[in-house]
From Swiss-Prot:
Xref: HAMAP family: RfcL
Binding site residues for ATP: G63, P64, P65, G66, V67, G68, K69, T70
Quaternary structure, from the entry: Heteromultimer composed of small subunits (RfcS) and large subunits (RfcL).
Described purpose of this protein according to its UniProt entry: Part of the RFC clamp loader complex which loads the PCNA sliding clamp onto DNA.
Example of a GO MF term: ATP hydrolysis activity
Stored CDD domains: AAA (cd00009), HLD_clamp_RFC (cd18140)
UniProt cross-references to SMART domains, sorted A to Z: AAA
Gene3D superfamilies, alphabetized: 1.10.8.60, P-loop containing nucleotide triphosphate hydrolases
Name used for this protein in its record: Replication factor C large subunit
Record's keyword terms, sorted: ATP-binding, DNA replication, Nucleotide-binding
Top-rank taxon, per record: Archaea
Length: 422
């Protein structure tokens, strides 16, 4: 079986990694200031002496998929001859499992003459704080006590739940690669594979990859599969281009920074576009983007009209109205007369509404369990339970604690939690 090209052409050294000089300098400086590393490596790459670099307890590499976060750590370990203990935080989630894997890795002796050990927590934003039984807290504990380099990667480390991790780490942002930089890498691979690739074909792959070099290399290998050694633009069009997944931050950025109406409208064609999520995020991002009250008011007016359309669609199933709703919500919010030139970087905040829903999730789960139990045993509808029975039980339980105790036993929920629901 052929080796995947993303592995075959993975950079082996710092010098081979494309256009991430700032990240390389910061990471190398941190290693050289706090740990043992070859003198020649430090002389070439350790360019920073900042206080925040020297005081960081760990490094958190942040950036979109395919920009080289994991590759950068592998190259670092190879350059300084450290054994890399790599864990994917999406797979090794619990505190017990983390302690088991890390503990074993640190206890075992290094083979092949390694100079030391370092730990990589890959995709740390894959952890779910509530569900993953202390995984995040254990990572923080490991960072606080470790005597070896701890490096993490994340696509989006700015979720509020990861603030404790950011507080003890230095966040190093990796840039999305430009179309030209991706094309240059693809060109080198074509030459190495003995394939004749049209420039327009390579540019089409690079453009659809949106700076994700890993995706671009995978696409190139797919187009040249089966022993093919010629790639044209017609081949790309015949097979079809990649439609990349976008985060909500990227969706908002594309909408607000669209240069014309159709460009903003086209965001809805992306498979990751979700109207409900977009509406919630847009509601809170409009005043962040548009400081002018009149422009912000116009944006809110168009978004509210789009919501009216969506409400009617849900009630009547008149899906022929959907284009009008999307044009108002996307193009209407983006293309406003007098709209100012927007800065390159806009700090979109995570919606407070979603944060409040997340915080109340457990309370709502307990309430739903209670309503379900009462509906089955009293042979009443859930709406009646919510609007009448709950209030009756609440009044009765104030003078009769046995009601709460019986419900607690029946549902397997702590009596204090039952009381909080009532």
């Amino acid at each position: 079986m052929a080796l995947p090209w993303i592995e075959k052409y993975r950079p082996k050294s710092f010098a081979e990694i494309v256009n991430q000089e700032e990240a390389k300098y910061t990471l190398a400086s941190w290693i050289c200031l706090k740990f043992r590393a070859p003198k020649e490596f430090c002389t070439r790459w350790a360019k920073k002496r900042d206080k925040e670099v020297a005081e960081a307890k760990a490094i958190l590499l942040a950036g979109p998929p395919g920009v080289g976060k994991t590759t950068l750590v592998h190259a670092l370990a190879r350059e300084i001859r450290y054994e890399l203990i790599e864990l994917n935080a999406s797979d090794v989630r619990t505190a017990d499992r983390l302690r088991q894997v890390i503990g074993r890795g640190l206890r075992e002796s290094s083979l092949f003459g390694f100079e030391g050990k370092m730990v990589l927590f890959d995709e740390v934003d894959g952890l779910h704080v509530k569900e993953d039984k202390g995984g995040l807290e254990e990572i923080i504990e490991i960072i606080e006590t470790a005597k070896i380099p701890i490096i993490m990667t994340a696509n989006n480390p700015y979720d509020p739940k990861f603030r404790p991790l950011r507080d003890i780490s230095l966040v190093v942002n990796l840039k999305r690669l430009s179309e030209e930089e991706v094309v240059e890498v693809l060109r080198r691979i074509c030459t190495s594979e003995g394939a004749k690739c049209e420039e327009e074909a390579l540019r089409s792959i690079a453009k659809s990859s949106m700076g994700d070099l890993r995706a671009a290399i995978n696409d190139l290998q797919m187009y040249l599969s089966g022993g093919r050694r010629i790639l044209t633009l017609d081949d790309i069009k015949r097979v079809g281009e990649r439609n990349p997944q976008l985060s909500m931050f990227e969706i908002l950025d594309r909408v607000y920074k669209a240069r014309w109406f159709d460009e903003a409208r086209a965001v809805s064609f992306n498979p990751s576009f979700d109207w409900e999520q977009y509406f919630i995020w847009a509601l809170e991002s409009i005043p962040v983007v548009y400081k002018d009250l009149e422009i912000a008011s116009t944006a809110y007016d168009r978004l509210s009209k789009a919501d009216v359309f969506m409400g009617r669609i849900k009630r009547t199933q008149e899906w022929e109205l959907l284009p009008y709703a999307l044009e108002l919500a996307l193009g209407g919010v983006s293309q406003i007369k007098g709209k100012p030139r927007l800065p390159p970087f806009i700090k979109y905040g995570f919606p407070q509404r979603l944060l409040l829903l997340a915080k109340s999730k457990e309370a709502r789960r307990r309430r739903d369990a209670l309503v379900e139990y009462l509906a089955q045993n009293l042979h009443a509808s859930k709406s009646v339970i919510k609007s009448e029975i709950i209030y009756v039980l609440s009044a009765l339980s104030k003078n009769n604690q046995s009601i709460i105790e019986k419900l607690s036993k029946a549902l397997g929920i702590n009596a204090i939690d039952i009381k909080s629901v009532l």
